[in-house]
């Protein structure tokens, strides 16, 4: 008898559209002849929580936020009310509850499973609705295997609460945990306690590992280059927008029922020193035929490509195929700001329905871009951004500060460069990320080259003891002698960027923002 699978998304992820992992794995396994079902418990549980504590008013607000007929601008006040309700639940009922995450901070730093297990055992706002929907899903699908995706720290507790319920009520069902968080954080796990909840932990893309678990011979090389998602079991009417800004680029992550696709597997560059390029799901680059991708775009109108970076040559082919078929679609996704994005290619993308791109400018400094092997320069990036602008394609830039050897002067030089991009309308949205050293990055393999020392290597006794009960390990502490005060610099960068997003302060210098931060600190006594 072949196994029957139920694939689950645990609480909590974004509310406007389903997280794609189960849809792609469902489509793949069904193509191999398996009985597979899926449920998004995240959206079901968060709706129940909000209605349980907000009553009829919350239900009416969610109905308004779910409606495609209500303009985004009219959803701003409703979004504010639902945000306030979520904060009230967090303050008065369950301090771990977040609108699209649960106990995220603890989960992100959980080297020891003990802190997580306390939250798993502690009853919180999700427990009752989660049990109700699990009971219903298992009764409907009668699975022999349940697979749970854990893409982010904010889904970790929810995933293990699912396992706790299934262990108690259906001990014969095999439990499997996979997803992005598992692939990056749990590769070095030595603690045995998580195995009392899950039977198996799968790393990287789930296609080949899941087939092996189900008893079939499979290697990564045997897997298809493109997998069409299956939407059976997804109720699109349950999802709702959260409109927190007037910035149209910034809204894309929280507004709209985007169907998520992957144009290519892995990253075609996979050289950035800060990235987890050692991991197979990033460095195994494969790209399908454009027709396969566009086939999956025939049944909808809005798509978000969740690639590490969409390959320009494939983007061209996909755009041409969309136009050849006469499809009326909108799409956006992640790119690298390199010279492949010519004005001609960007115009073609726009005609084919591309409305926005996101990409990394990182530290926005040529010395640092070279040091991190980013493969772009400020000049080449500006040319690409200008081409997107002229084609009417919006841009979000990922920014970084605190990179090893970065100076205060370079950080404020980057701020000035970014200010110029906003003033010229070459970017419409951005976000500063503070550099984090991850164990799977080239920097972690050769820290001396970047002027840093890995901090936990200093106390080998503690490190060896911790290794025996290690749960999560991805971000690792480091020491950089003489580094600037990145906490203080980060305040300045983030204040300036917040204003840029709203179209304010575009004539202010870095020194102006520094003075403003100092005045605020004096006024608040901090």
What residues fall within each predicted segment?
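Radical SAM [4Fe-4S] cluster-binding motif and immediate context
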Residues: 232-394
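A structural motif corresponding to the C-terminal lobe/cap of the Radical SAM core domain
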Residues: 6-13, 20-21, 144, 198, ...
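Hydrophobic anchor at the start of a short beta-strand
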Residues: 5, 36, 175, 303, ...
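Flexible loop/turn segments at secondary-structure boundaries
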Residues: 13-16, 45-46, 153-157, 183-185, ...
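Glycine-rich beta-alpha loop elements in corrinoid/cobalamin-binding modules
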Residues: 4, 12-15, 21-46, 104-231
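Residue-level recognition of beta-strand->loop/alpha-helix junctions
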Residues: 40-42, 279, 399
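Conserved Radical SAM active-site core
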Residues: 44-46, 50-51, 58-143, 189, ...
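Radical SAM enzyme core and accessory elements
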Residues: 2-10, 24, 30-31, 45-65, ...
């Amino acid at each position: 008898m072949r196994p029957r699978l139920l694939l689950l998304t645990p609480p909590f992820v974004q509310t406007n559209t389903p997280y794609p992992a189960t849809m792609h794995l469902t489509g793949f396994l069904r193509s191999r002849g398996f009985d597979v079902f899926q449920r998004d418990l995240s959206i079901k549980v968060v709706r129940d929580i909000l209605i349980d504590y907000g009553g009829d008013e919350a239900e009416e607000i969610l109905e308004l936020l779910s409606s495609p007929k209500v303009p985004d601008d009219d959803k701003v006040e409703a979004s504010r009310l639902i945000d306030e309700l979520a904060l009230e639940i967090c303050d008065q009922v369950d301090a771990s509850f977040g609108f699209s995450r649960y106990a995220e901070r603890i989960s992100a730093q959980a080297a020891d499973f003990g802190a997580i297990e306390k939250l798993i055992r502690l009853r919180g706002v999700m427990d009752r609705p989660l049990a109700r929907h699990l009971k219903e899903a298992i009764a409907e699908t009668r699975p022999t295997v349940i697979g749970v995706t854990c893409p982010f720290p904010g889904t970790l507790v929810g995933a293990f609460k699912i396992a706790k319920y299934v262990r108690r009520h259906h001990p014969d069902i095999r439990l499997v945990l996979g997803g992005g968080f598992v692939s990056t954080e749990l590769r070095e796990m030595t603690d045995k306690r998580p195995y009392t909840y899950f039977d198996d932990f799968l790393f990287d893309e789930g296609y080949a590992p899941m087939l092996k678990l189900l008893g079939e011979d499979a290697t990564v090389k045997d897997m298809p280059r493109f997998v069409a998602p299956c939407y059976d079991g997804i109720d699109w009417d349950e999802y709702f927008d959260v409109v927190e800004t007037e910035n149209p680029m910034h809204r894309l992550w929280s507004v709209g029922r985007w169907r998520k696709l992957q144009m290519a597997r892995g990253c075609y560059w996979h050289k950035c020193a800060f990235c987890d390029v050692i991991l197979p799901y990033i460095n195994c680059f494969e790209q399908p035929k454009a027709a396969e991708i566009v086939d999956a775009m025939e049944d909808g109108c809005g798509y978000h490509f969740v690639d590490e970076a969409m390959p320009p040559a494939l983007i061209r082919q996909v755009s041409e195929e969309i136009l050849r078929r006469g499809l009326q679609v909108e799409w956006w996704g992640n790119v690298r700001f390199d010279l492949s994005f010519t004005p001609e290619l960007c115009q073609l993308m726009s005609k084919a329905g591309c409305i926005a791109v996101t990409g990394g400018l990182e530290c926005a400094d040529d010395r640092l871009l070279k040091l991190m092997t980013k493969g772009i320069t400020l000049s080449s990036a500006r040319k690409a951004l200008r081409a997107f602008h002229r084609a009417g394609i919006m841009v979000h830039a990922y920014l970084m500060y605190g990179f090893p050897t970065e100076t205060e002067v370079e950080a404020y030089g980057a701020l000035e460069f970014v200010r110029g991009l906003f003033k010229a309308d070459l970017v419409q949205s951005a976000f500063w990320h503070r550099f984090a050293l991850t164990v799977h990055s080239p920097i972690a393999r050769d820290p001396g080259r970047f002027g840093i020392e890995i901090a936990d290597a200093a106390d080998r006794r503690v490190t060896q003891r911790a290794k025996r009960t290690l749960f999560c390990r991805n971000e690792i502490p480091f020491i950089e002698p003489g580094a600037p005060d990145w906490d203080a610099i980060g305040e300045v960068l983030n204040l300036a960027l917040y204003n840029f997003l709203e179209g304010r302060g575009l004539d202010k210098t870095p020194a102006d923002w520094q003075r403003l931060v100092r005045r605020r600190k004096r006024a608040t006594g901090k």
